[in-house]
Amino acid sequence: MHYQFLWENALQENGYAYQLLPQTRPLRSAEDGAAYFGIAVGQTAPVLLVEAAPSQYYLCLLAGDRGRLDLVKAAALLNAPKLTPVKYKKVYDITGFEPGNMPLFGLNFPCLFDEALLRYPLVYGGSGQENLTLAVDPRALLALHQIAARLK
């Protein structure tokens, strides 16, 4: 059983398909999540927090098969001089979530959206509750986030 997430109302009101899927163990990588749910690695949606300047953060919504984010390319797309991944403890201090458990919704940062997520009817990522994965229509990510740039 889970509590009602605030973002669930927005998904329902806008008609986006989603499911909350319980897990029996933590999932620590895109490959681990794909194997657990029997999906393609590209169907997983890891969330990365990056910093462009002091206290200027971007949420990166990525396809799991992208590999490492090209920070130089991402910075150019966001018109930022440079991007650095936010360190583990600082991610928790800023968001209240540990890296690897950051939710696809509920964090109010401008986003870099990976268009590769649109290959699938549902993508799988964090719900914000440990051992509960969100499978959601990737178009909801585009519609319900402040998209600063799109990664092709």
Which ranges hold each PLM region?
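Extended, low-hydrophobicity, polar/charged segments
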Residues: M1-K152
